[in-house]
């Protein structure tokens, strides 16, 4: 089953959902809302160091659970995200984040920053051309494999039917009955 839609770029550029989120807009950290602010700050920083966080686009209410690792990372082993994905050093009091993902069948990268005190900031989605091409190639391979297997099945089925028809004809010839084909 393909993980992406056939024309990802078109969907990203034309769908209202993506158009809204591709403009830089206000975001907020949404984790542990029931906890005191100081605890939320500490939990947010720890989550970033672990390579994950929950954010929301304020204007649309869209919530995302982000992972700050390269798209190829499978999560088999625990690792710390690189500075490319979680940058606590670029600007004092802020963390810059990057999270690749497939969202609604489209390869995107969420990019943004969050103020470490207020736990809000700015972020947006960008189309991930490189990953889109990789996923398109995988989808095409899966399609071709399914087509090949269907052809093989149809060939085996046709061969089996022909073999059965020959056997039935031979059996009828031995018993002396005539066969009428529909």
UniProtKB/Swiss-Prot annotation:
Q: What superkingdom heads the lineage?
A: Eukaryota
Alphabetically sorted, this entry's keywords are: Chromosomal rearrangement, Disease variant, Dwarfism, Nucleus, Phosphoprotein, Proto-oncogene
User: What InterPro entries does UniProt report for this protein, alphabetically?
Assistant: CBF_beta, CBF_bsu_sf
Which biological process terms from the Gene Ontology are attached to this UniProt entry? Answer: cell maturation; definitive hemopoiesis; lymphocyte differentiation; myeloid cell differentiation; negative regulation of CD4-positive, alpha-beta T cell differentiation; negative regulation of transcription by RNA polymerase II; osteoblast differentiation; positive regulation of CD8-positive, alpha-beta T cell differentiation
- List localization entries: Nucleus
Task: Look up the record and report any one GO term of the cellular component aspect.
Answer: membrane
Record site: Breakpoint for translocation to form CBF-beta-MYH11 oncogene in AML, subtype M4EO: 165-166
**Disulfide bond sites:** none
The task this protein performs is described as: Forms the heterodimeric complex core-binding factor (CBF) with RUNX family proteins (RUNX1, RUNX2, and RUNX3). RUNX members modulate the transcription of their target genes through recognizing the core consensus binding sequence 5'-TGTGGT-3', or very rarely, 5'-TGCGGT-3', within their regulatory regions via their runt domain, while CBFB is a non-DNA-binding regulatory subunit that allosterically enhances the sequence-specific DNA-binding capacity of RUNX.
Which disease is the protein involved in? A chromosomal aberration involving CBFB is associated with acute myeloid leukemia of M4EO subtype. Pericentric inversion inv(16)(p13;q22). The inversion produces a fusion protein that consists of the 165 N-terminal residues of CBF-beta (PEPB2) with the tail region of MYH11. Cleidocranial dysplasia 2: A form of cleidocranial dysplasia, a rare skeletal disorder with significant clinical variability, even within families. Patients typically present with delayed closure of cranial sutures and fontanels with multiple Wormian bones, retarded ossification of the skull, shortening of the distal phalanges, dental anomalies including supernumerary teeth and eruption failure, clavicular hypoplasia or aplasia, wide pubic symphysis, vertebral anomalies, and short stature.
Similarity-based family: Belongs to the CBF-beta family.
PANTHER family from the UniProt entry: CORE-BINDING FACTOR SUBUNIT BETA (PTHR10276:SF3), CORE-BINDING FACTOR, BETA SUBUNIT (PTHR10276)
Q: How does it assemble?
A: Heterodimer with RUNX1, RUNX2 and RUNX3. Interacts with COPRS. Found in a complex with PRMT5 and RUNX1.
User: What name does this protein carry?
Assistant: Core-binding factor subunit beta
**Which species expresses this protein natively?**
Homo sapiens (Human)
Ranked from the top, the taxonomy reads: Eukaryota, Metazoa, Chordata, Craniata, Vertebrata
Q: Which gene encodes it?
A: CBFB
